[in-house]
Amino acid sequence: DPLLSIAVAFLILKSAWALVQQSGHVLLEGAPAWLDRDEMQQKIIERVPEVTGIHHVHVWGLTPQDLMLTMHVRIAPEASDLTGVVRRVKATLKDDYGIGHSTIETETADCADH
């Protein structure tokens, strides 16, 4: 009986471990493992020509389906429609990555945080 109890306990732990890992990742608001930030930044720069650089990117999930993002986006000095640029960046994030809530800080000069 003790050996059988240990075997059952091991099976329960083994099957629950993935759920514990995923739950811990969500509770700690970790970044989604599938998201390639470099690829995402490159895609935004290609789709929105007024964007000349991206940094300070932070992505986390409140749930596996509810992703949040903050980023700094450097805008070309000659860009005139900053609101339109931000809308296109947000559309790319939502359409391609499912990031429905994003905060985009625009910069036309050096970042004040550096």
Model segments located where?
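Alpha-helical transmembrane segments and adjacent TM-loop junctions that form the membrane-embedded core
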Residues: 1-114
